[in-house]
């Protein structure tokens, strides 16, 4: 069962039913949701437990659930080293339903371009193609990080 699916289940149980579960307690429900067709017309028991959950990690759990749901994306974005580049990125690339949730940039002197790590939350997962097309069209696209788990671990 993917880690993101477990995080999604933890959040659903908390938000819908007020149940605080630990990751191990959510695995059974996650597996049942993913493979429900294998359990049709069968009796299934699932143990739900929550004693080993640190509630302060909810933001991390939410982040991983959003990445798993294809709603949160991280990029290396190439910015031209000139005034107005960030404004151009926001005006020409970011959609009205997109939200920049992470931005890390260090200005470098004597370079034509510099890079920023940008996290963007989408309202709809289908908007990812449009977002990356706009980045490429305006020359901002550097690299997509969601498919690089080792790099992504540094961010979430």
Give residue spans per PLM region:
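Catalytic phosphate/nucleotide-handling subdomain of diverse soluble enzymes
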Residues: 33-63
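A short, charged, Gly/Pro-tolerant segment at domain boundaries
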Residues: 26-27, 46-52, 150-154
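Short glycine/serine/threonine-biased micro-segments
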Residues: 16, 23, 43, 48-49, ...
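A conserved regulatory-domain signal marking ACT and ACT-like small-molecule sensing domains
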Residues: 55-156
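Active-site-adjacent helical/loop segments in soluble small-molecule enzymes
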Residues: 1-41
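Short, glycine-/Ser/Thr-/acidic-enriched flexible segments
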Residues: 5-6, 26, 51-53, 82, ...
């Amino acid at each position: 069962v993917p880690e993101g699916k477990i995080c999604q289940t933890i959040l659903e149980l908390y938000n819908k039913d007020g149940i605080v579960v630990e990751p191990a307690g959510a695995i059974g429900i996650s597996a049942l949701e993913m493979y429900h067709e294998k359990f049709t017309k069968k009796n299934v028991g699932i143990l739900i437990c929550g004693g080993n959950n640190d509630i302060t990690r909810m933001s991390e759990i939410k982040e991983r659930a959003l990445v798993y749901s294809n709603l949160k994306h991280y990029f290396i974005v190439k910015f031209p080293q000139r005034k107005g580049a960030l404004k151009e990125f926001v005006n020409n690339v970011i959609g009205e339903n997109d939200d920049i949730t992470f931005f890390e940039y260090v200005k470098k002197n004597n370079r034509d371009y510099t890079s920023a790590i940008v996290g963007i939350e989408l309202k709809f997962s289908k908007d990812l193609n449009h977002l990356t097309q706009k980045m490429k069209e305006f020359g901002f696209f550097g690299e997509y990080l969601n498919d690089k788990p080792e790099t992504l671990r540094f961010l979430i």
